[in-house]
Structure formats: structure tokens, C-alpha cells
């Protein structure tokens, strides 16, 4: 690939540097004392609208004391600040949900939790305790854009504590069946089907602590996804903490390897060849590189949705989602 074509390709499919950072001065809450890492689904980068944020909450904060109305459907995921085990919250959080102000319900958690907030629902996040400043809470927000299909209401009946259908916590978030056995730390998975929601949005957080290769050969999907690599240094979200070599290309005979040492996002449109992804250097196994996949597609995970360059999947069939 020529230099000019490489630059054109990069502009189309790759984002890094200050383009993916929300400066801490622009964070909505002063308790978020570090820059936030943002994936913007802009017209020239996927075109879905909406955004995904990865940030840190350093001190207790009551975000919306009067409960805010969600103008778009969104997923909010609150993880512990230790990437070696995101499941351990090392703090406490209260989540308020309701379909109107006269019917608000408060749920308390001392373990990591994900919440699905329907469009028009009232909600609040109140972080009441953080055990240690060295372990700020890792806060992730996925906000739907106008182009992403809105889901129907989450399935289920509001009986007793029925709003719990919008909340998943603790070991439920642990992707125990993920096929990458080289990844020794818990992998986090959050998907709309977990909540009974109709729209096919899924995310994974995979902490990679040792040099090795994930997805060892090129393939493409029939759905849209973003491949995100970010570091776990709150002081500098652009610090990847190592080196990743990621292969990507518009046809199988013209693949290019991008070598990155900064937190970087890749837009992978349907049919775009990608992988292998080689984690060639990890500076500190206690500060792993996070491989995060954000997927938008019907039928995600089905064997007919992925095409491998040699026609053979290296992974066993995935178990059905519950």
C-alpha cells in the first residue's frame, strides 16, 4: 500500500490521539478527574450517531439527584478500577430507575453492574463510596444515535422488583465461555439480549496481560463493529501500555498492518477484512491492554455472520445466549 493510500485508509478507518479524547475540563462531573476516552460514531466514522465513553470516577458523585430523563436509549456499565478483575467494584453505587417521577426505584450494588436505560426513562447514578483513590471506578456509557434502531421495551413484567430486569451485575457480566484462553483475567461482556432488548448491540472488555495473538487469521463480518484498544493508565488514556499490530484491508490481497502504541479505535465496516491482532509487547501485566469490541448487528455471533480467509473458523461454536 502506497503512503498516500495508507493515509487515506487511516483517515477512513482509524482514530487515535486527541481525536479520541474528551479533556477532563469538559467532563460533566468534577469527580471525573482524568481525560475520557471517547468513540464518536460520527458521519465520517461509521455514521451511526451516538457515542461510547470510557472514563474514571475518582470521588463519590450523585449525578442526577432529581433523576434525569434519558433522551436516547443507553447502556451504562460501572466496573471496578482494577483491570486485573473488573468484576470487583471496590466501592458502592445506587442506581435509580423509573418510567415516571412517581415510580422511582433505587437499587444498591457493591459489585460491578450494567444498566439498560430505555428512551424516556428516568435514571440516576449515585456513586456513594470508592474504597481507594488508587482504584477509581471505571465508567462506560454507550448512547444510541438516531440511526441506531431503538429497541422495543425490555421484555418481562414489572412484578415486585421488576425493574431489576434492566440491571445485570457481578458474575453475570463475566464472559466465561470466551474462546481466548490466553486471556487470564476476567473478560466482561454486556449485550442487549441479556436485558431482553431487541436491538443487537454488544460490547466486550478483554484485558490482555501477556504478549500473544488473538484471532490469528484474517476474516470479515456481515455486521458493523468497532475494534478498540486502550490502556489502563487513568493519568493518560492515550498510553496503550504496549504495542499492538492489527491487520486490516478492503480486500484479502491487500492487507495492511497498523502498529500502534497509543490507544486507538478502528471502524470495521461489514465486509472489511481484519486480523490477526498481535499483542507484541505488554509493559506491565498488572496494567493490561484492553481489547474492546463494540458490535452493531442482527444475528451477531451466528456462524453465518463471519467469513474466514481460508473458510475455517479457529474457534468452537459459541453457546447460545441466555
Label for each model-derived stretch:
Residues 2-18, 22, 126-175, 238, ...:
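Double-stranded beta-helix
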Residues 71-74, 222-225:
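Extended extracellular/luminal ectodomain segments enriched in beta-structured repeat modules
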Residues 79-81, 121, 230-232, 264, ...:
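Short, flexible loop/turn elements at secondary-structure junctions
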Residues 53, 112-120, 135-143, 202-204:
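Extended, hydrophobic interaction surfaces within ordered domains
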Residues 99-129, 252-280:
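Conserved metal-binding segment of the jelly-roll/cupin
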Amino acid at each position: 500500500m502506497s503512503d498516500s493510500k495508507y493515509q487515506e485508509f487511516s483517515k477512513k478507518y482509524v482514530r487515535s490521539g486527541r481525536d479520541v479524547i474528551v479533556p477532563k475540563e469538559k467532563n460533566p462531573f468534577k469527580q471525573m478527574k482524568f481525560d475520557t476516552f471517547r468513540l464518536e460514531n460520527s458521519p465520517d466514522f461509521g455514521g451511526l450517531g451516538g457515542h461510547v465513553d470510557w472514563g474514571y470516577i475518582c470521588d463519590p458523585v450523585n449525578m442526577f439527584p432529581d433523576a434525569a430523563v434519558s433522551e436516547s436509549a443507553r447502556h451504562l456499565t460501572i466496573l471496578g478500577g482494577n483491570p486485573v478483575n473488573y468484576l470487583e467494584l471496590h466501592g458502592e453505587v445506587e442506581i435509580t430507575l423509573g418510567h415516571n417521577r412517581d415510580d422511582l426505584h433505587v437499587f444498591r450494588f457493591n459489585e460491578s453492574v450494567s444498566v439498560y436505560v430505555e428512551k424516556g426513562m428516568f435514571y440516576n447514578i449515585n456513586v456513594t463510596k470508592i474504597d481507594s483513590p488508587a482504584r477509581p471506578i471505571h465508567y462506560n456509557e454507550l448512547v444510541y444515535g438516531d440511526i441506531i434502531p431503538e429497541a422495543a421495551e425490555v421484555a418481562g413484567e414489572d412484578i415486585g422488583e421488576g425493574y431489576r430486569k434492566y440491571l445485570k451485575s457481578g458474575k453475570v457480566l463475566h464472559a466465561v465461555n470466551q474462546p481466548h484462553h490466553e486471556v487470564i483475567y476476567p473478560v466482561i461482556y454486556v449485550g442487549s439480549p441479556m436485558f431482553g432488548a431487541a436491538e443487537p448491540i454488544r460490547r466486550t472488555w478483554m484485558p490482555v496481560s501477556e504478549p500473544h495473538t488473538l484471532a490469528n487469521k484474517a476474516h470479515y463480518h456481515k455486521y458493523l463493529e468497532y475494534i478498540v484498544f486502550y490502556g489502563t493508565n487513568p493519568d493518560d488514556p492515550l498510553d496503550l501500555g504496549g504495542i499492538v499490530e492489527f491487520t486490516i484491508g478492503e480486500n484479502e490481497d491487500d492487507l495492511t498492518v497498523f502498529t500502534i502504541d497509543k490507544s486507538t479505535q478502528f471502524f470495521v465496516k461489514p465486509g472489511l477484512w481484519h486480523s490477526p491482532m498481535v499483542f507484541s509487547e505488554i509493559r506491565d501485566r498488572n496494567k493490561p491492554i484492553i481489547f474492546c469490541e463494540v458490535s452493531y448487528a442482527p444475528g451477531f455471533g451466528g456462524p453465518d455472520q463471519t467469513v474466514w480467509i481460508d473458510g475455517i473458523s479457529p474457534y468452537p461454536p459459541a453457546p447460545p445466549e441466555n
